[in-house]
């Protein structure tokens, strides 16, 4: 199992390859706001653990294992963002909130959150009802 830090790199590499068709050390460093030498060290570790294939100066390619995990990590992140929107978290806080919790939830919890997102998306009245509860609670606290 990858560590939370490894997950961040795999997720970002997956997104870059999906968006650009490739992922360079400099692109990964910029996206994660880290030094390129840190990226190189992590990429070498991910190569050793068979999440990707890395050749210095030639770029990198995710292995089947890396692609599968990358896809699952992107799904988890997107699902948690959807969940935050449904429960009414301010848009400007969603990304940081998701980054703060995504590595601490079990895959079972992610699956149950997925069920809840699906439940709310199947009937918009449910979201409206939730908003009504939130408004009532805000009025009580004022």
From Swiss-Prot:
Coiled-coil regions, chain positions: none
UniProt entry keywords in alphabetical sequence: Activator, Cytoplasm, DNA-binding, Manganese, Metal-binding, Repressor, Transcription, Transcription regulation
Record entry for activity regulation: DNA binding is strongly activated by Mn(2+).
Predominant location category: cytoplasm
Binding site for Mn(2+) 1: 8, 99, 102-103
Gene3D superfamilies attached to this UniProt entry: Iron dependent repressor, metal binding and dimerisation domain, Winged helix-like DNA-binding domain superfamily/Winged helix DNA-binding domain
Cited SMART domains: HTH_DTXR
Gene Ontology BP, a term: intracellular manganese ion homeostasis
Residue ranges of domain HTH dtxR-type in the record: 1-63
Sequence positions that bind Mn(2+) 2: 11, 77, 99, 102
Record's GO cellular component terms: cytoplasm
GO molecular function: DNA binding; DNA-binding transcription factor activity; manganese ion binding; protein dimerization activity
Localization per record: Cytoplasm
Subunit composition and interactions: Homodimer.
Alphabetical list of NCBIfam families matching this protein: PRK03902.1 (NF003025)
Family statement drawn from the similarity comment of this UniProt entry: Belongs to the DtxR/MntR family.
Purpose of the protein: Central regulator of manganese homeostasis.
Protein name: HTH-type transcriptional regulator MntR
Natural source organism: Bacillus cereus (strain ATCC 14579 / DSM 31 / CCUG 7414 / JCM 2152 / NBRC 15305 / NCIMB 9373 / NCTC 2599 / NRRL B-3711)
């Amino acid at each position: 199992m990858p560590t939370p830090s490894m997950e961040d790199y795999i997720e970002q590499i997956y997104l870059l390859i999906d968006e650009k068709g490739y992922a360079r050390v400099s692109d990964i460093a910029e996206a994660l706001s880290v030094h390129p030498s840190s990226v190189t060290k992590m990429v070498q570790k991910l190569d050793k653990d068979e999440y990707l294939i890395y050749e210095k100066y030639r770029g990198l390619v995710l292995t089947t294992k890396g692609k599968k995990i990358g896809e699952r990590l992107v799904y988890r992140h997107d699902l948690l963002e959807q969940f935050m929107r449904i429960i009414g978290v301010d848009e400007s806080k969603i990304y940081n909130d998701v980054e703060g919790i995504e590595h601490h939830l079990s895959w079972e919890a992610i699956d149950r959150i997925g069920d809840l997102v699906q439940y709310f998306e199947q009937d918009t009245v449910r979201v409206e009802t939730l908003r009504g509860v939130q408004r009532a609670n805000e009025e009580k606290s004022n």
